[in-house]
């Protein structure tokens, strides 16, 4: 049967605010470098005030949203299940999804029920990405926001690992995965962040259940989940929980397991300035490839090229024209 959507994604809806800082500033502000940390609203407002002079651009973020936006820019179709508040940031966020060609669940939240989440993104000169997120109303994402008919009309269900921090969102992920499996929709999960694998491992294992069709992880996340410092053991662990996986390794490229063979995908040599969104972009390129007739190797090449490009500029997204050029160059080989 024909599918209405290539991917049905579930994730946090956060407006990103980017700041260029030094590692010393992060230390003086008491911010853990290189990971995502959840903070309360008061703490977030305090940081915004202290760093007002270094504030960069504001954009719609959320890991799975970034993935679906890149999928749509490449020419794919997506539905994004999320939750925003009835405020300026929420309106900005929904308009952005709409402008990108993505469908989303209706938002009928009344004023006063909660505010749209924000993520402070700190970029250091070494191109590392550090995040402090206040989830706001996104933290109460639940089965209420799900559109099961849209899910059943999709090729893939994409779950964002960050949702593990919210009991209601985690429960929605588990239910969505069960419905996907009953409906012949392939399931995939992104581990999202080393801190998720470290502090919410039991919850991630609940979300994984009996396993997924496709797992996205970076090396640090895979090692943390496997409880090892040995890459081969981490690979064996990934094989035990996913039929296929893509394991990203930064400048060393990525490893893709297609169900039979472990493929090594190189990555273009670039000078990274901001690694925010690299994993999201990789997943978007990979899922576009798989849903548009590419084999795992070709999809991996597209994913690597798009991720390598996004780290050379600030922010988690690329212009559509740039992504289309990359797609054409990969298809031409």
From Swiss-Prot:
InterPro entries: Carb_kinase_PfkB-like (IPR052700), Carboh/pur_kinase_PfkB_CS (IPR002173), PfkB_dom (IPR011611), Ribokinase-like (IPR029056). SUPFAM superfamilies: Ribokinase-like. It is an enzyme of class 2 (transferase). Its EC number is 2.7.1.-. One of its GO terms (molecular function) is kinase activity. Keywords: Kinase, Transferase. It comes from the Bacteria. Transmembrane segments: none annotated. Belongs to the carbohydrate kinase PfkB family. This is Uncharacterized sugar kinase slr0537.
